[in-house]
Structure formats: structure tokens, C-alpha cells
Amino acid sequence: MSTLHKVKAYFGMAPMEDYDDEYYDDRAPSRGYARPRFDDDYGRYDGRDYDDARSDSRGDLRGEPADYPPPGYRGGYADEPRFRPREFDRAEMTRPRFGSWLRNSTRGALAMDPRRMAMMFEDGHPLSKITTLRPKDYSEARTIGERFRDGSPVIMDLVSMDNADAKRLVDFAAGLAFALRGSFDKVATKVFLLSPADVDVSPEERRRIAETGFYAYQ
């Protein structure tokens, strides 16, 4: 069957029975580029070629691994030694760390220079005239005021007094110290120190008076 007759039959210009399946068996000529012809083995996977290429580039994975350099960061960090925990000296760990500090702080805060303590009660020092008074009631406030007015430091012991009278005497002594520009300090429970304006008693001296016993100052 000619090509022209096939075209006519395709468009209905010729009866269908005039051609058979030969139309489908004939192949039209290729209108594009000529396709390359391949062998029958085209597309067939061959694992040997892949293994050979992989072995050439990375070494035989089925055997011994390739000799790769150790992993590391850029800049030479891999060459630096790894961090190791510090090994402490056992003698250093067992050494008391706060003993000397406590001794020094106690010596500096609570203790006083013995020479300074001796000078406090030498003749001519204002604290050498210190007086301890133990009033029984508020009526003895006059004696406290006179001693303080004369320039003598006064230790006022109110332990034997009831709270009401002790409070009144504390108010009186505080007002007296304020009026004469002195100082009024607590050295122990219900024990107070009245210091004239020309007598400067440091906190260390007040603590020392309370520790050594104010009963010694008569």
C-alpha cells in the first residue's frame, strides 16, 4: 500500500478495509536528529564498574579502609592538646584555708593593742577616771549627771533596776549626753557608757570594756 493511500485512509478519504495492520507496522521516518545506536548492554547495571571507580577514588571499601588524616578543625586546632582536668595537690586540699584568716580577723577586730589598753587607764588619760555606777532606782540619776558633768566617763549598770526605771534613766542619760555634746553607747545588756565630749572611745575600746568586765572600773 502506498503512502498516499494510507494518508487518504487515515483521513477517511479511502475505505478502511483497503488497508490492514500494515499501517501500524510501518514506521514513519524520523523527523528529528538521528538517534545514536547503542548496544544491547545499554542501561544494564554492572556493579563491577562502580566498584572499580569507587576503589580508585576512595579505596577498597570491602577491604581495609583508606588512610584518611585524623578529623580536625581548620586553623590547627587538632594539633592542640586536649583539655585535662587539673590535678590538685592532696596536701593543698587538706590544708586549712580559713584558719589563719579567722585568727587574723579575730586578732584585728576584737583584740586591742595591750599598750593602748594600758595607756587608757594611766594617770592623765580621760578613761583613767572612768566610774561605774549601779543605781537602784531613778533617784540616783543626779549622781550620774554630776560625774558626767565633771568630765568623768560613766559606766551605767542598770541590771538591778526594773525595766520601767531603767528606761527612764536611759532617756535621762541620752538627753544629758546630747546636752553636753558627749556620747552615749551601749556596751552590754542594760549597761551603757557615758563619755564626755573630750573623750573619744573607739568601738574596739567599748568592746574591750565589755569583755574584760566593767565591774573592774570603780
UniProtKB/Swiss-Prot annotation:
Subcellular location: Cytoplasm
Top-rank taxon: Bacteria
Transmembrane segments: none
GO biological process, any: FtsZ-dependent cytokinesis
Compositional bias segments (type: Basic and acidic residues): 36-65
Activity regulation, free text: Inhibited by 1-{4-[2-hydroxy-3-(naphthalen-2-yloxy)propyl]-1,4-diazepan-1-yl}-3-(naphthalen-2-yloxy)propan-2-ol (also known as compound T0349); the binding of this compound blocks its interaction with FtsZ.
Region (Disordered): 20-81
The keyword Oxidoreductase appears for this protein: no
InterPro entries noted in UniProt: Cell_div_SepF, Cell_div_SepF/SepF-rel, SepF-like_sf
Region (Interaction with ftsZ): 115-203
Keyword Cell division: yes
GO cellular component: cytoplasm; plasma membrane
Coiled coil residues, start to end: none
Keywords: Cell cycle, Cell division, Cytoplasm, Septation
Described purpose of this protein according to its UniProt entry: Cell division protein that is part of the divisome complex and is recruited early to the Z-ring. Probably stimulates Z-ring formation, perhaps through the cross-linking of FtsZ protofilaments. Its function overlaps with FtsA.
PANTHER family referenced in this protein's UniProt entry, alphabetically: CELL DIVISION PROTEIN SEPF
Family: Belongs to the SepF family.
Subunit (UniProt): Homodimer. Interacts with FtsZ.
This protein's name: Cell division protein SepF
The species this protein was found in: Mycobacterium tuberculosis (strain ATCC 25618 / H37Rv)
